[in-house]
């Protein structure tokens, strides 16, 4: 009877995962229709729905298991046998690696994230050596120009599954050929071999053709974002062929792609050649398997800890009033813990901070908000924690700590990609770097605002600079929707002495924001003020923000480009 119960539990979990991934593929498969219909609000809703599917199905399985087991508590040996039986179901299972993560999620939900040990759940994969030796159908098709690059591109683009007409396909092909010839020599292109993914990658208002360009043994990305005009006709907006550009397109600050992937591991391996700087966790996350991305992030952390002797330290930069942030000196992630008590000027609650981080997870991040992974009961060996950090943890988050003697448990934290704090970057920047940083910062604010996100606290310390020089927002405790804010002009003073008073001469409600005030706390430095006024002076005008609000209320969804505007074919034509 017991063995049958263990078998039933294992099969119930795997069937639950099958149901979840089936719904995942179903929502993903609708991406083409939503794109063709230009139903951008449905695109946003589908993105949120797909994110929620995972936790929903974990909850369904947990309820089934409680019914099956009559909510009995089982010993360690029983749980180990369930995992062993589940492992035995996976050798021929096509999505075994994500099925392992689903098992982990069910276990954590049942046992409140306690006793997270390798004998009870898949801290490490049961099949680390397994690769997809046989794939039911190829992920990509091969194309060789044979001296006729334009003809080959015509064949590739006409063969797409999209059912809309092209605005001017021959024009776009000419642009693509021009971009390729500018990037590579004739000698390189003589051996050109293209591999084009069968499935389009959908995100925001674009459908991305993703491919590889093989030249004399070297491999380059070949990325074409397809948009449509106001008449519903298709056009290609640019052609990207560098690994740095591809890395930004698949960046950690962007929403997940909608791409139909029955075999996600195979797609991850295929993408790895054009995204060599991306970790396994980042690749899974980029294609929408963010929960397995979380598993892989933890495994990458464990691998780093195993091969390193570094101690955890307080992260460089200005200490936050809401979050305690720490890192390892050469690790590319940071760890963020919500403080038990906030600074007096912070009028937020712990619950509100959690809501803000969830909002960011579900919202279109437009390349300007860092994705996070959330962990509970995170265990760290005490000898790996610097004395300064340990004292800080004990002072700022004692309610979230559990001391196990040689280890500490942090009850809740976020893991996030590490960046250089913008304020520190600006302190070391030369004039051109400073100008570029201010341009990027202003663009980040504007793109977030256009996506209905107001950062709240706009100080430079709340933004980071990526290795590609992009500015990304990462402090979410005051974030809110643009439509919730009342942007006001400062009323003129009634009397000359009003301007000298310590208190404002006008009433201020909780949601009131006065953009004129941004100038005072952002532009105390003369050079910063000059660059800001030159490139982003409109951010100091309440009318600019109210205009954006009106566009949002009118239902307008802004275009989001994962590349510079000057790279757009339409801009090249103007130049």
UniProtKB/Swiss-Prot annotation:
Record-annotated disulphide pairs: none
GO cellular component term of the entry, any: cytoplasm
Catalytic site: 371
Protein name: Isocitrate dehydrogenase kinase/phosphatase
EC number: 2.7.11.5, 3.1.3.-
Lineage per the UniProt record: Bacteria, Pseudomonadati, Pseudomonadota, Gammaproteobacteria, Enterobacterales
Sequence positions that bind ATP: 315-321, 336
Assigned keywords, A-Z: ATP-binding, Cytoplasm, Glyoxylate bypass, Hydrolase, Kinase, Nucleotide-binding, Protein phosphatase, Serine/threonine-protein kinase, Transferase, Tricarboxylic acid cycle
Keyword Magnesium: no
Pfam family, one: AceK_regulatory
Gene Ontology biological-process entries: glucose metabolic process; glyoxylate cycle; tricarboxylic acid cycle
HAMAP family the UniProt entry points to: AceK (MF_00747)
Claim: Ligase is one of the keywords in the record: no
Protein role: Bifunctional enzyme which can phosphorylate or dephosphorylate isocitrate dehydrogenase (IDH) on a specific serine residue. This is a regulatory mechanism which enables bacteria to bypass the Krebs cycle via the glyoxylate shunt in response to the source of carbon. When bacteria are grown on glucose, IDH is fully active and unphosphorylated, but when grown on acetate or ethanol, the activity of IDH declines drastically concomitant with its phosphorylation.
Location in or out of the cell: Cytoplasm
The family this protein is said to belong to: Belongs to the AceK family.
Main location: cytoplasm
GO MF entries: [isocitrate dehydrogenase (NADP+)] kinase activity; AMP binding; ATP binding; phosphoprotein phosphatase activity; protein serine/threonine kinase activity
Catalysed conversion reaction: L-seryl-[isocitrate dehydrogenase] + ATP = O-phospho-L-seryl-[isocitrate dehydrogenase] + ADP + H(+)
Stored InterPro entries: AceK_kinase, AceK_regulatory, Isocitrate_DH_AceK
């Amino acid at each position: 009877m017991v063995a049958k119960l263990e078998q039933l539990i294992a099969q119930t979990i795997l069937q639950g995962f099958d149901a979840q991934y089936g719904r995942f593929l179903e929502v993903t498969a609708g991406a083409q229709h939503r794109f063709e219909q230009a139903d951008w609000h449905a695109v946003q809703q589908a993105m949120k729905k797909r994110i929620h599917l995972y936790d929903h199905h974990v909850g369904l399985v947990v309820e089934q298991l409680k019914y099956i087991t009559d909510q009995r508590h089982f010993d360690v040996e029983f749980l180990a046998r369930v995992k062993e039986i589940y492992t035995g179901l996976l050798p021929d299972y096509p999505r075994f690696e994500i099925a392992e993560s689903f098992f982990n999620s069910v276990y954590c939900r049942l046992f409140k994230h306690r006793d997270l040990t390798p004998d009870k759940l898949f801290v490490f994969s049961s099949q680390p050596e397994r690769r997809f030796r046989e794939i039911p159908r190829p992920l990509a098709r091969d194309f060789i120009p044979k001296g006729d690059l334009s003809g080959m591109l015509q064949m590739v683009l006409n063969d797409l599954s999209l059912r809309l007409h092209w605005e001017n396909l021959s024009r776009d092909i000419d642009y693509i050929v021009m971009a390729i010839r500018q990037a590579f020599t004739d000698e390189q292109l003589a051996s050109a071999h293209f591999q084009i993914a069968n499935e389009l990658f959908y995100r925001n208002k674009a459908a991305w053709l993703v491919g590889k360009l093989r030249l004399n043994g070297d491999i380059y990305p070949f990325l074409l974002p397809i948009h449509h005009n106001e008449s519903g006709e298709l056009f290609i907006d640019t052609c990207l062929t560098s690994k740095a550009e591809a890395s930004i397109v698949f960046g950690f600050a962007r929403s997940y792609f909608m791409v139909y992937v029955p075999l996600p591991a195979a797609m991850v391996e295929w993408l790895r050649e054009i995204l060599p700087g991306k970790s396994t966790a980042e690749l899974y996350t980029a294609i929408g398997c963010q929960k397995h991305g979380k598993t892989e992030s933890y495994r990458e952390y464990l691998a780093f800890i195993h091969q390193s002797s570094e101690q955890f330290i307080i992260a460089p930069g200005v200490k936050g009033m809401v979050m305690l942030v720490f890192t390892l000196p050469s690790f590319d992630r940071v760890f963020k813990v919500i403080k038990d008590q906030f600074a007096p000027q912070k009028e937020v609650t712990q619950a509100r901070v959690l809501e803000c981080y969830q909002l960011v997870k579900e919202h279109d991040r437009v390349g300007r908000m860092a994705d996070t992974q959330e962990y509970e009961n995170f265990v760290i060996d005490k000898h790996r924690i610097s004395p300064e950090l340990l004292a800080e943890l004990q002072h700022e988050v004692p309610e979230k700590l559990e001391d196990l003697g040689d280890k500490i448990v942090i009850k809740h934290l976020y893991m996030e990609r590490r960046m250089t704090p913008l304020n520190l970057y600006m302190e070391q920047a030369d004039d051109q770097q400073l100008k570029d940083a201010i341009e990027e910062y202003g663009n980040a604010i504007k793109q977030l605002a256009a996506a209905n996100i107001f950062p709240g606290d706009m100080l430079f310390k709340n933004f980071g600079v990526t290795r590609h020089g992009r500015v990304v927002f990462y402090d979410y405790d005051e974030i809110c929707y643009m439509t919730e804010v009342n942007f006001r002009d400062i009323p003129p003073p009634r009397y000359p002495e009003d301007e000298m008073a310590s208190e404002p001469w006008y009433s201020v409600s909780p949601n009131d924001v006065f953009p004129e005030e941004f100038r005072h706390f952002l532009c105390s430095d003369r050079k910063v003020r000059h660059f800001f006024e030159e490139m982003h002076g409109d951010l100091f005008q309440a009318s600019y923000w109210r205009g954006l609000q009106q566009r949002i209320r009118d239902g307008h969804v802004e275009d989001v480009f994962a590349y510079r505007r000057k790279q757009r074919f339409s801009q090249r034509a103007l130049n």
